[in-house]
């Protein structure tokens, strides 16, 4: 769970099961032209020997585009996780998971590069990132 370095995030972040370790590839859910995002590192993870840093819903991470527009590929970018397949527990006791892992490309202030998001955005992510919530079609 990232505790530091969440750029434009607002509010407190609760413990969420981390489902996307370094090396994971997820869908890009915005309209920037990127198809896949490859996780390079996760902001705010201090870590432990031999443990891979992992990201969960609402975490900001460093990524690169593996498939998509040529002008986005082979560059180091920032992204935020908006959905994950690994289930996590909400404060009301319910467990939730999504059918895919997805993220969006943001700048270091937390503002989206794209202008629209396909599919739902987790409520935990929308609470932390107001600019992502503004572009979300639905919040689950």
Swiss-Prot record:
Matches recorded under PANTHER family: 50S/60S RIBOSOMAL PROTEIN L14/L23, LARGE RIBOSOMAL SUBUNIT PROTEIN UL14
Protein name: Large ribosomal subunit protein uL14
HAMAP family reported for this sequence: Ribosomal_uL14
Family matches, as Pfam families: Ribosomal_L14
Gene3D superfamilies named in the record: Ribosomal protein L14
Cellular component GO terms, alphabetical: cytosolic large ribosomal subunit
UniProt keywords, alphabetically: Ribonucleoprotein, Ribosomal protein
Molecular function per GO: large ribosomal subunit rRNA binding; structural constituent of ribosome
A biological process term (GO) from this entry: translation
Similarity comment text for this entry: Belongs to the universal ribosomal protein uL14 family.
Taxonomic source organism: Caenorhabditis elegans
């Amino acid at each position: 769970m990232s505790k530091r370095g969440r750029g434009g995030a607002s509010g407190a972040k609760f413990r969420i099961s981390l489902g996307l370790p370094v090396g994971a590839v997820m869908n890009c859910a915005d309209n920037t032209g990127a198809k896949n995002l490859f996780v390079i590192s996760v902001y705010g993870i201090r870590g432990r020997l031999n443990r891979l840093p992992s990201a969960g819903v609402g975490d900001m991470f460093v990524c690169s585009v593996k498939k998509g527009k040529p002008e986005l590929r082979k560059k180091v970018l920032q992204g935020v996780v908006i959905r994950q397949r690994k289930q996590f527990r909400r404060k009301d006791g319910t467990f939730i998971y999504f059918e895919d892992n997805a993220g969006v490309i943001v700048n270091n202030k937390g503002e989206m590069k794209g202008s629209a998001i396909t599919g739902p955005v987790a409520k935990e992510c929308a609470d932390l990132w107001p600019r992502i919530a503004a572009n979300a079609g639905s919040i689950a």
